[in-house]
From Swiss-Prot:
CDD domains: MraZ_C (cd16321), MraZ_N (cd16320)
Protein's name in the database: Transcriptional regulator MraZ
Pfam families: MraZ
GO molecular function: DNA-binding transcription factor activity; transcription cis-regulatory region binding
Organism phylogeny: Bacteria, Bacillati, Actinomycetota, Actinomycetes, Mycobacteriales
Signal sequence interval, chain numbering: none
Organism per entry: Mycolicibacterium vanbaalenii (strain DSM 7251 / JCM 13017 / BCRC 16820 / KCTC 9966 / NRRL B-24157 / PYR-1) (Mycobacterium vanbaalenii)
Length: 144
């Protein structure tokens, strides 16, 4: 499971050092894909494969939106293996999509990581901070 917020820097070659505490969970490979809110999602490879199998089994191939989603997901996914220093190389397209600059934020999102441009993360936090309690009540209802 992935929790916490970290602030690694993106180097000139597009490499990002993953937080040390997550490296063991990602050592078997990881999948980087576009996510919501112009961020990137980083999934452990095995868990991503399970997710894709479930999505593929349930997707209604006759539905144009389902086909578009699957097509986009497959096209925007990049398999990576962290190097000895725990770095991954983010593609130019992923860096463009997430507007990544040198200053980045990596957040734990329970089952996966998110990579954000630092300013975009700050803006997102400011926009949603006041609504956190209301959103948790609405999204989680009686669970909490």
């Amino acid at each position: 499971m992935f929790f916490g917020t970290y602030t690694p820097k993106l180097d000139d070659k597009g490499r990002l050092t993953l937080p040390a505490k997550f490296r063991d969970a990602l050592a078997g490979g990881l999948m980087v894909t576009k996510s919501q809110d112009h961020s990137l999602a980083v999934h452990p490879r095995a868990e991503f494969e399970e997710m894709i199998a479930e999505i593929s089994a349930k997707a209604k191939r006759g539905n144009p939106q389902a086909r578009a989603y699957l097509r986009n997901l497959a096209a925007s996914t990049d398999e990576q293996y962290p190097d000895a220093q725990g770095r991954i190389t983010l593609s130019a397209e992923h860096r463009r999509y997430a507007n990544l600059t040198k200053e980045c934020v990596v957040t734990g999102s329970i089952g996966f990581l998110e990579i954000w441009d630092a300013q975009a993360w700050q803006d997102y936090q400011e926009l949603h901070e006041e609504n956190f309690s209301a959103a948790s009540d609405e999204a989680l209802g009686d669970i909490l």
